[in-house]
């Protein structure tokens, strides 16, 4: 357990550094380009590589782990050889996919941004084609990440986004005046290449990064792997398609809506990426091991993960709800990012925040279903989610503008999470005692959330400060103080366990 806590601490620290750089990158983009037609073109152009990586790259990162773990129980050498073959296959496929999207870029961008004028579409096409080859490097990086994380070597995968963010920051400051938005696109591609370079020294000892074309010899494993990954890819594409739908609808709204939606989603993802996803990352290899061993610890780990994610999310959500405008102003309010841009972004950010916990829980539940090789469930629930999101985005944006689009996403995430929970008893034997304890603890967590939210909101009205940073610090301090106090009052299990771990760790 101490090793898990230590790993979580290390990758959380790296994630903070990475996200601060990423946030600095986004802040500079906002300051230099604002919510303009140029920034809209860049954000639409980045969707295709992002969707390809998030749907295929993240699927590889998650899906290869149980395959590698199963084979490794029999032979380390065979496990490495299989990963070499699969890695080669994925890389070849990524090149083919890149070529196809390169050819059909104008068609795809016109679908994603139907409200763009011709000049804006041409800029979007150029930026997209520059960034598309990054997908090939992302696939190689994903193969490396899956093995390193299973081997509990979390540091190199956590470091991969740092050089990319640094390159983009340098490009914005020193090159954007000369090359404009193209400087960001080019450095995005360079940064993707460095994701492979950073992980290579650590992955070299596992002997998996070599071209191995023995596809026929490993036909059965390849077939089983593709059958496992295919539903995951469909599920990931469906989830990423939500972002496309959001931006398609936003492109029909007033100019700058796409950028406001992008800035808001990145602000919402900040605590998710820094705290919640690292926790899922360090726990996932243990979930896979428990699934391979087929013991009774899998059920306990599942509910424990849900409890921990909910517990950690509560103070984050309260600060986001109470100080949504202040967070947006602190993050972006400079340069050409004016009052109008701030209003639009705040509107979207508040409603995106409603879905943060459900996004984290969805990721955790999806990992569980991957570990037990029931990936079709993740596919079905993702399809339900995207259909709901399309209907709600179109409907709610008529009333709430970009806020309606964000609210639609949050409602879709909420629905998907509870459908995944519905399938749990069908795939896992759940002890009645464990389930009752889980339900009781969540009642306590809900009471803690409600009590802390009401008092924090009341206090924030009383101590309004002219400096945004002071206001945010005060709200965060009172939120944490009240959260710990109510957790103690309601006897929340996670507070007691966190206290015990702290003293044991010391």
Language-model features and meaning:
Residues 155, 163-197, 376, 384-422, ...:
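Membrane-interface helix-loop junctions in multi-pass transport and translocation proteins
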Residues 1-4, 200-239, 300, 426-443:
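Interhelical loop/hinge segments that connect adjacent transmembrane helices in multipass membrane
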Residues 98-118, 318-338, 458:
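Short membrane-interface helical motifs at transmembrane helix boundaries
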Residues 58-73, 276-295, 366:
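Helix-loop junctions and terminal segments of transmembrane helices
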Residues 116-144, 337-365, 451:
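Alpha-helical transmembrane segments of multi-pass membrane proteins
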């Amino acid at each position: 357990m101490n090793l898990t806590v230590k790993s979580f601490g290390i990758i959380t620290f790296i994630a903070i550094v990475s996200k601060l750089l990423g946030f600095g990158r986004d802040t500079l983009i906002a300051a230099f380009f604002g919510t303009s037609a140029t920034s809209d073109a860049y954000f639409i152009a980045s969707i295709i590589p992002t969707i390809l990586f998030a749907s295929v790259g993240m699927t590889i990162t998650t899906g290869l782990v149980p395959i590698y773990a199963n084979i490794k129980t029999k032979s380390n050498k065979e496990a490495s050889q299989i990963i070499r073959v699969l890695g080669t296959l994925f890389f070849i496929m990524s090149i083919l996919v890149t070529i196809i999207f390169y050819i059909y870029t104008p068609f795809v961008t016109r679908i994603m941004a139907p409200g763009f004028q011709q000049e804006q579409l041409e800029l979007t096409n150029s930026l997209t084609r520059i960034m598309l080859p990054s997908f090939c490097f992302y696939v190689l990086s994903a193969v490396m990440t899956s093995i390193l994380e299973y081997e509990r070597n979390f540091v190199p995968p956590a470091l991969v986004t740092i050089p990319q963010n640094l390159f983009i920051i340098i490009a914005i400051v020193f090159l954007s005046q000369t090359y404009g938005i193209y400087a960001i696109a080019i450095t995005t591609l360079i940064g993707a290449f460095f994701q492979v370079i950073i992980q290579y020294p650590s992955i070299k000892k596992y002997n998996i990064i070599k071209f191995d074309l023995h596809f026929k010899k490993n036909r059965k494993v390849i077939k089983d792997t593709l059958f496992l990954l295919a539903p995951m890819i469909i599920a990931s594409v469906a989830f990423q398609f939500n972002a496309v739908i959001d931006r398609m609808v936003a492109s029909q709204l007033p100019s700058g809506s796409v950028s406001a939606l992008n800035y808001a989603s990145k602000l919402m993802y900040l605590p998710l990426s820094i705290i919640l996803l690292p926790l899922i990352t360090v726990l996932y290899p243990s979930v896979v091991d428990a699934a391979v061993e087929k013991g009774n610890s899998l059920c306990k780990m599942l509910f424990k993960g849900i409890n921990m994610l909910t517990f950690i999310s509560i103070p984050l959500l309260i600060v986001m709800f109470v100080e949504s405008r202040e967070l947006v102003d602190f993050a972006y309010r400079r340069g050409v990012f004016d009052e109008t841009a701030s209003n639009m972004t705040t509107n979207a950010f508040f409603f995106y925040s409603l879905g943060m916990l459900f996004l984290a829980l969805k990721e955790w539940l999806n990992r569980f279903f991957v570990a037990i090789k029931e990936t079709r469930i993740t596919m079905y629930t993702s399809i339900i989610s995207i259909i709901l999101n399309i209907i709600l985005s179109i409907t709610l944006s008529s009333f709430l503008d970009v806020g309606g689009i964000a609210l639609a996403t949050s409602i879709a995430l909420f629905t998907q999470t509870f459908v995944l929970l519905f399938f749990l008893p069908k795939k896992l034997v759940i002890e009645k005692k464990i389930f009752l304890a889980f339900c009781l603890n969540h009642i306590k967590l809900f009471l803690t959330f409600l009590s802390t939210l009401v008092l924090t909101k009341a206090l924030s009205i009383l101590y309004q400060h002219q400096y945004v940073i002071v206001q945010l610090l005060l709200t965060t301090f009172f939120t944490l103080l009240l959260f710990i106090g109510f957790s103690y009052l309601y006897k929340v299990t996670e507070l007691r366990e966190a206290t015990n771990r702290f003293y044991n760790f010391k």
